[in-house]
Amino acid sequence: MSSSADTHYQTLSIEHKEGADWLTLNRPDAFNAIDQIMTEELLDYFGKLYFKHEVRVVVLRGAGKHFCSGLDLNDAGHFGTSNPADMRGQRLISEIIMRMRRCPQPIIGLIQGAATGGGFAFALACDVRYAADNARMNVAMAKIGLTGCDIGISYFLPRAVGASSAAEMMMGGRFVNAKKALRMGLVSEVVESEDLEAAGQSLASDMLAMSPMGLRMTKE
């Protein structure tokens, strides 16, 4: 299998394998929290995908033990210094979500460890979600005086789990573990942590075996 790596980004790692981009959120020391640089780089990456016909599938994952812990509240000037800064950060992340949905490539989300707040929004914006058995997900924004509705969660979550369960997660802030996520329909499959990459590779291979135009039009 041929592959190539993209070293253009600081907070993202991209490996291209036979028609699939393996896009890794790469701030493991910060649990892949979303800072200003990651926001700008994700906007750039997903904004360019429409014209990258050599990329037919995207596999999104997090480096280290966690998928994404949400907004980096220590990122001065972007999040955490004031409510206006927090809201601006949320609006930029909402644009990432829109670009994820607009791109014609299906996105497979591989979720391990924590997927909270903005990280949970990234997971919801994926077309298919697989979870490791240690995955935990929640909507954390309301706990810090923000809304869980501005970055796509209030749109995608009720469609995945129903209105009552979505309201419970958005207003209660409770964590959902992998087994419950599977029962709720949040994820398609739960596997052991060491098998998560193989599960993603298997589905990516199935997608790549489809007609390129058929796959693209189905996502669109």
Residue ranges of model-derived segments:
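Hydrophobic alpha-helical membrane-association signature
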Residues: 38-42, 89-92, 122, 196
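Conserved CoA-thioester-binding segment of acyl-CoA-metabolizing enzymes
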Residues: 1-63, 98
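Terminal peptide-recognition signature
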Residues: 23, 27, 42, 60, ...
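Glycine- (often His-adjacent) and acidic-residue-rich active-site loop
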Residues: 6, 54, 62-99, 115, ...
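Conserved phosphate-binding and hydrolysis motifs of nucleotide-dependent enzymes
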Residues: 26, 32, 64, 70-72, ...
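Crotonase-fold acyl-CoA enzyme core
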Residues: 98-215
